């Protein structure tokens, strides 16, 4: 797998911090560390073993930890993240395309 998921995780955290700041939602640093850990675990798996998208992981975590159903979209977290998610999707599609040959 060529895709660098660590960059994607970093952009998710950066975008979420900005989103929370803009919307005056306060969390401690442990919140971000735990989310980063969950994202790293899921996204380090081979594509065929990943059961959730990064956005699903993010929103599920927020719902469970903050008891808020915010349904944050990648667009709300910045264009860099949007681009990285597109690349992640392309890499995932390539993975499955290669497996079908």
Where are these regions (language model features)?
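Short terminal alpha-helical segments
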Residues: 1-32
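Residue-level detector of well-ordered alpha-helical segments, enriched
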Residues: 4, 8, 30-35, 50-54, ...
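Charged, low-complexity interaction regions
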Residues: 20-29, 47-52, 70-72
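Amphipathic alpha-helical segments that form the core helices of the histone-fold
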Residues: 33-44
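Short amphipathic alpha-helical segments at helix boundaries and their inter-helical linkers
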Residues: 43-53, 89-91
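Amphipathic alpha-helical binding modules
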Residues: 65-101
């Amino acid at each position: 797998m060529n895709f660098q998921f660590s960059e994607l995780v970093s952009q998710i955290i950066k975008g979420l911090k900005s989103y929370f700041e803009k919307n005056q939602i306060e969390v401690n640093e442990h919140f971000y560390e735990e989310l980063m850990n969950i994202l790293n675990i899921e996204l380090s798996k081979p594509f065929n073993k990943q059961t959730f998208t990064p956005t699903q992981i993010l929103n599920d975590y927020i719902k469970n930890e903050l008891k808020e159903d915010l349904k944050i979209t990648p667009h709300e977290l910045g264009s860099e993240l949007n681009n990285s998610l597109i690349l992640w999707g392309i890499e995932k599609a390539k993975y499955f395309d290669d497996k079908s040959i």
